[in-house]
């Protein structure tokens, strides 16, 4: 594929069928953002296996299940704690997009539909071999199996090793091999497979030999200090699941070390929910600083709807808020639009921003020259 989004892989093995992931494309709207699920809607499916709970991997799941109500949905136990919250939030977002942008396809599914399919969801521990051929009628042979391996990307993320009678396949999903602030790196050392499907956003870019995560975090903390010193506010656009918690952990450790003052940090409502789950499930995850409880270490305040457009930005505030790519009608987009042009403030990117998104436009902009941030804000 030329870009990321709408991840979905249909696998036929030993007379059985497995769908791995069912995402939506972040740059396409309505049904155009879905995988080509209509191609297989009349074909029997044994199971669906999920790598992790980001929308580009699970956002189309209810639509996939609509034609395959007998298929069980397999995921890690940590993803099991997240999946319903992610999908219910997706309904809320789609309903708002229908109202604000007139996208008639939205919502692609409803809250009631999610409640109906929730009993299909099953969570498993890492490194456990799981039979998945629930439809026994096609073959008397033993069921193929799958096993989840920690991918180190976000809470609950996994690579999926599928074993058949003669062949094995490994699908990584999104993977992070280096330890982050909280999560340890991927644990793929024991994987042996005949076929590898590997997703990577930056696979053709080598990591500079001088790169150091510790040095980058130190630069970020120092930049935050300098911004607050000049009475500006700090915006760190993040995704609610994963990057938000990693950045909050870095801020908590910097505060504990005396590098930052203890002060309110503004996050989104969904970010708060996922942060609570990170805290509650710390003992189940393969993570560093397992005793670090983010809600106890930081003074987290949920930014209410519409507050980003009106609250005062002077005096030094820290926002760790969605959306990571500053999509329109999000708090990060609205805050950035207000901060740009005021040299006191600082906007710091800590992850990928697609070049065609407002975040990508801002990253590519040249200081002092006009640029189009988004259609709603203009230059």
Identify the residue ranges that each predicted region occupies.
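Active-site-proximal loop/helix segments of hydrolase catalytic cores
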Residues: 152-157, 166-194, 199-201, 205-209, ...
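Core dinuclear metal-dependent hydrolase active-site scaffold
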Residues: 1-43, 123-184, 310-312, 318, ...
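Glycine-rich phosphate-binding "P-loop"
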Residues: 200-217, 236, 379
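Short, conserved loop/helix-junction motifs that constitute active-site signature segments
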Residues: 40-43, 67-68, 188-192, 260, ...
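Metallo-beta-lactamase
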Residues: 87-154, 283-315
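Active-site neighborhood of phospho(di)ester-bond hydrolases with catalytic His/Asp-centered motifs
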Residues: 20-22, 45-54, 61, 73-76, ...
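Hard-cation-handling environments
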Residues: 220-360, 371-373
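Pre-active-site segment of Zn-dependent metallo-hydrolases
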Residues: 6, 10-71, 75-117, 121, ...
């Amino acid at each position: 594929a030329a870009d990321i989004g709408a991840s979905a892989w249909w696998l036929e093995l030993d007379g059985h069928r497995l769908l791995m992931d069912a995402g939506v494309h972040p740059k396409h709207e309505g049904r155009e953002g879905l995988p080509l699920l209509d191609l297989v809607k009349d074909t029997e499916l044994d199971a669906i296996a999920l790598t992790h709970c980001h929308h580009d991997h699970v956002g189309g799941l209810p639509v996939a299940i609509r034609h395959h109500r007998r298929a069980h949905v397999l995921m890690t136990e940590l993803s099991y704690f997240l999946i319903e919250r992610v999908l219910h939030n997706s309904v809320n977002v789609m309903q708002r997009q229908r109202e604000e942008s007139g996208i008639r396809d939205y919502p692609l599914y409803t809250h009631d539909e999610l409640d109906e399919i929730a009993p299909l969801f099953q969570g498993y521990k890492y490194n456990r071999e799981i039979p998945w051929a629930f439809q026994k009628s096609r073959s008397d042979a033993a069921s193929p199996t799958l096993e989840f391996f920690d991918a180190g990307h976000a809470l609950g993320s996994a690579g999926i090793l599928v074993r058949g009678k003669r062949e094995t396949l490994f699908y990584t999903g999104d993977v992070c091999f280096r330890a982050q602030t909280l999560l340890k790196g991927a644990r793929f050392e024991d994987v042996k497979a005949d076929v590898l499907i590997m997703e990577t956003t930056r696979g053709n870019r080598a990591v500079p030999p001088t790169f150091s995560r510790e040095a980058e975090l130190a630069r970020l903390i120092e930049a935050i200090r300098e911004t607050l010193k000049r009475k500006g506010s700090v915006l760190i656009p993040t995704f609610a699941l994963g990057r938000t918690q990693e950045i909050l952990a870095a801020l908590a450790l910097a505060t504990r070390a005396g590098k930052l003052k203890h002060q309110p940090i503004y996050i989104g409502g969904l970010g708060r929910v996922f942060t609570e789950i990170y805290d509650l499930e710390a003992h189940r995850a393969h993570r560093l600083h397992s005793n670090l409880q983010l809600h106890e270490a930081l003074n987290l305040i949920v930014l209410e709807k519409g507050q980003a457009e009106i609250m005062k930005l002077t005096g030094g505030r820290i926002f760790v808020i969605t959306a990571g790519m500053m999509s329109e009608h999000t708090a990060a987009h609205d805050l950035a639009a207000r901060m740009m042009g005021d040299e006191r403030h600082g906007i710091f990117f800590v992850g990928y921003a697609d070049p065609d998104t407002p975040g990508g436009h801002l990253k590519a902009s040249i200081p002092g020259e006009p640029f189009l941030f988004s259609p709603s804000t203009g230059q």
